[in-house]
UniProtKB/Swiss-Prot annotation:
GO MF term list: lipid binding; proton-transporting ATP synthase activity, rotational mechanism
Keyword set, alphabetical order: ATP synthesis, Cell membrane, CF(0), Hydrogen ion transport, Ion transport, Lipid-binding, Membrane, Transmembrane, Transmembrane helix, Transport
Keyword presence, Endoplasmic reticulum: no
Taxonomic superkingdom: Bacteria
Chief location: membrane
Residue ranges crossing the lipid bilayer per the database entry: 13-33, 63-83
Site (Reversibly protonated during proton transport): E70
Gene name, Swiss-Prot/TrEMBL: atpE
InterPro entries on file: ATP_synth_csu_bac/chlpt, ATP_synth_F0_csu, ATP_synth_F0_csu_DDCD_BS, ATPase_proteolipid_c-like_dom, F/V-ATP_Csub_sf
Protein name: ATP synthase subunit c
Membrane disposition: Multi-pass membrane protein
Organism: Acholeplasma laidlawii (strain PG-8A)
Length: 86
């Protein structure tokens, strides 16, 4: 079994395949980050609908949360671009 892994790690084809697999997983993570942002925005709109007087506080909190989620999505896309260029 060790011989199999030694041969596979030495081939360029196997390394390229793993790089593309990692890029695909990164794209999946970026897509899930987008879904999370949409859900957060939907909940913020519901909260403003229930308490319009707190809209400023809700909006600021939502924007900070969106920024934190967006950074992970951007990092995932950068990783995907790096891995797919190898």
């Amino acid at each position: 079994m060790n011989t199999f892994f030694q041969i596979m790690t030495q081939t360029e084809f196997f390394a390229t395949g793993l790089a593309y697999l990692g890029a695909g997983i990164s794209i999946l993570a970026a897509g899930l980050a987008g879904i999370g942002q949409g859900l957060a925005a939907a909940r913020a709109v519901e909260a403003v609908g229930r308490q319009p007087e707190a809209s400023g506080k809700i909006t600021v909190t939502m924007i900070l949360g969106q920024a934190m989620v967006e950074t992970s999505g951007i990092y995932a896309l950068i990783i995907a671009f790096i891995l797919s260029s190898k």
